[in-house]
């Protein structure tokens, strides 16, 4: 069996879909369906069972046996970069992850987890090294702290001549694609611009969006990376992005091209994002490629075209 936490979320449900397409359906999905809209991400997927996140964590902490587990994809987290309740964030993203990690280490279960490019903050060098990290929000800090916790475990194991089972962290950059309808304000810019045009409006971008550049990565490619590392058993913390920085304006142009209508408009930059907003991200893929992962990443034009064809069908 494979366990996918956050399996009703955007990335988690797409991983389940990718596993199904690979002929795997012995899957336990763990999530919190308090936001009931997320059920839509699961209705077309084949899984063995579903478990609430709190019940799952209780059983993990009790050391319960789930039977043979091939791997755990840990995608479950509070991913709202605008959430400033640090106690809540650290409990959900840090403590929960540590419990699950040690459960896997004790049983030699491969543990593949979601980190984030939010760990980098304002740097212009996006290399998986501590010196380039400095989160701008508590979400990024929670991910940064867990990455550092994993690094300490590796260092301790090395000093004692021990070999840990697989631990693989993925620093997701700006992920977009199908199954993000439930995310509200945290959904991708492509999602919001598409909705605006469908509502008969012009697509709206924040002032300065022609200069804001992010590494926008299509969720289907993210899943390919996850499955490659599952198959090859490589440990480490790796950037998961395209290696390209493209502007929000390029995303808007791709959405307009799909619809063949719409004129890009600008709106004031919101005060609550000032000082906590990454204006530039671009994954350095050196470490990913050195590991042997040869997944090719779609450009914004390619990814948005595929996404909106699915979204608007």
Swiss-Prot record:
Residues binding NADP(+) = 10-11, 31-32, 38, 53, 75-79, 92, 143, 175, 183
A Pfam family annotated for this chain is Epimerase
Q: Where does substrate bind?
A: 174, 185, 192, 206-209, 214, 277
Oxidoreductase as a keyword of this entry, yes or no, is no
- Which keywords accompany this UniProt record? Carbohydrate metabolism, Isomerase, NADP
Q: Where is the active site?
A: 139, 183
Q: Its pathway? A: Nucleotide-sugar biosynthesis; ADP-L-glycero-beta-D-manno-heptose biosynthesis; ADP-L-glycero-beta-D-manno-heptose from D-glycero-beta-D-manno-heptose 7-phosphate: step 4/4; Bacterial outer membrane biogenesis; LPS core biosynthesis
Q: Which GO terms describe its molecular function?
A: ADP-glyceromanno-heptose 6-epimerase activity; NADP binding
Names of required cofactors: NADP(+)
Domain notes for this protein = Contains a large N-terminal NADP-binding domain, and a smaller C-terminal substrate-binding domain.
Q: Which family does it belong to?
A: Belongs to the NAD(P)-dependent epimerase/dehydratase family. HldD subfamily.
Q: What does this protein do, in the record's words?
A: Catalyzes the interconversion between ADP-D-glycero-beta-D-manno-heptose and ADP-L-glycero-beta-D-manno-heptose via an epimerization at carbon 6 of the heptose.
Q: What is this protein called?
A: ADP-L-glycero-D-manno-heptose-6-epimerase
Organism whose genome encodes this protein: Vibrio parahaemolyticus serotype O3:K6 (strain RIMD 2210633)
Q: Recall the taxonomic lineage recorded for the source organism.
A: Bacteria, Pseudomonadati, Pseudomonadota, Gammaproteobacteria, Vibrionales
